[in-house]
A protein has these predicted regions:
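N-terminal Lys/Arg-rich, disordered targeting/topogenic segments
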Residues: 1-27
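Hydrophobic membrane-insertion alpha-helices, especially the h-region
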Residues: 28-46
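Substrate-binding cleft of secreted/luminal carbohydrate-active enzymes
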Residues: 45-53, 320-369
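N-terminal, intrinsically disordered, polar/charged segments of Gram-positive cell-envelope systems
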Residues: 50-107
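Aromatic-lined substrate-binding rim segments of carbohydrate-active enzymes
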Residues: 93, 146-190, 259, 264-298
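Active-site-adjacent "subsite" loops/lids of carbohydrate-active enzymes
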Residues: 102-113, 117, 192-244
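Catalytic domains of carbohydrate-active enzymes, especially glycoside hydrolases
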Residues: 123-151, 245-257, 320-330
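Aromatic-lined carbohydrate-recognition surfaces of secreted/lumenal glycan-active proteins
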Residues: 186-193, 254-258, 277-315, 354-364
Length: 369
């Protein structure tokens, strides 16, 4: 039997039939797969690390990272916001704060008087204040003790309480509301022309020489009235106590009027012990005593007539500017007026005499500033 030679088997591999195009596609697929794996690892890595860290500390180390993580994140975000805001803040220059205006500060502005008897409640007080502000006013004068000696608030002094006016105002409300509306409230107090106070306490009054009777500035039948005695320490104390009361209620500025003697001089007048001090000297001492008592806590104004300012009078014994007055309110009589030039001359002369602040009231010219 004839034998045929054994045929050699041929092994065939699939790669033997790969074309170039197939190899290219395979390479691209592998590259895409690698990129996908790397991307997935990149995304998952933080979470895996957080999980691993949390597991390590909570399971292995028995610790809780939630609180510390929150604090860390808060600190980090705070630092980032601070760093972000610093360039903006540094690029804008800081505006210097304006100095605060105190109640005792004297500012330029218009003045007006307020009828205290109309300030019956909070609504009336606020309405009056807003009307003045709408008219451009800065200062509001409220007479709290008049020339009759009546006091328009609940004074705690014995003499003031004995001479309470029929209308009483709530000082704290008046002062606070006027300030809220942008006004400077000024308490006006009549000083030595005070018949009610003299009758309530004879120790404060001028008497007839050698008698216990109160001296009157005219015949009783003609309506004569007693006056407070500028030489009496009790009188100076009483006026000072009234200043203290209105200041405690919120009035930082006070206008004192009738800081003077009666116009008449008579040998029948008994002022007690004068130690040889004349009228001008005693008024200067009284003004200095109030200034020493209140210092910078209260701004004290003094009101005088034009005649008392420009010349000497029996009431003062010297021009008002020579009494140590720093803040002066001058009243021009209604029968005359001052033009701008005359006001300038008056201001200059009083400034040279030592007056620091001057307000002129000229009703005929509708000028009060």
């Amino acid at each position: 039997m004839a034998r045929y030679p054994k045929r050699q088997k041929v092994k065939r591999y699939r790669r033997s039939f790969y074309t170039r195009e197939m190899r290219l596609k395979k390479g691209i697929g592998i590259a895409v797969l690698v990129v996908a794996v790397l991307a997935a690892a990149w995304v998952a890595a933080p979470h895996v690390l957080d999980w691993a860290t949390h597991t390590w500390y909570t399971v292995v180390r028995d610790r809780d990272l939630s609180a510390s993580s929150a604090v860390s994140e808060s600190a980090s975000s705070g630092a980032q916001s601070t760093a972000a805001s610093e360039p903006a803040a540094s690029s804008v220059p800081e505006k210097e704060p304006e100095p605060e205006v105190k109640g005792t500060d004297i500012v330029t502005g218009l003045w007006a008087e307020v009828d205290v008897t109309t300030l019956t409640d909070e609504a009336a007080i606020r309405s009056a204040a807003r009307q003045l502000k709408a008219q451009g006013m800065t200062y509001a004068i409220l007479t709290l003790k008049d020339t009759a000696g009546q006091v328009y608030y609940a004074s705690q002094t014995a003499v003031g309480a004995a001479n309470a006016a029929p209308t009483q105002v709530e000082l704290t409300s008046v002062a606070s509301i006027f300030k809220e509306e942008g006004l400077v409230p000024v308490a006006a107090l009549t000083a030595f022309r005070d018949p009610a106070g003299a009758r309530a306490d004879h120790a404060l009054a001028i008497r007839y020489r050698g008698q216990e009777y109160l001296w009157l500035d005219n015949k009783a039948s003609a309506g004569g009235n007693p006056w407070l005695n500028p030489y009496a320490a009790e009188t100076v104390q009483y006026i000072g106590d009234l200043i203290a009361e209105v200041h405690a209620a919120g009035f930082d500025q006070v206008l004192l009027e009738n800081v003077r003697f009666p116009s008449s001089t008579s040998a029948k007048q008994d002022y007690g012990t004068t130690n040889g001090v004349d009228r001008a000297g005693q008024l200067t001492a009284d003004i200095a005593a109030w200034q020493a008592r209140f210092g910078d806590t209260v701004t004290l104004w003094y009101g005088y007539s034009l005649a008392e300012v420009t010349g000497s009078s029996s009431q003062l014994g010297a021009p008002a500017a020579q009494l140590g007055v720093k803040n002066l309110l001058v009243k021009v009589p209604s029968s005359s007026t001052l033009d701008a030039a005359a006001r300038g001359e008056l201001t200059l002369s009083l400034t040279e005499a030592g007056v620091e602040h001057l307000v002129i009231r000229d009703d005929a010219a509708s000028y009060f500033e």
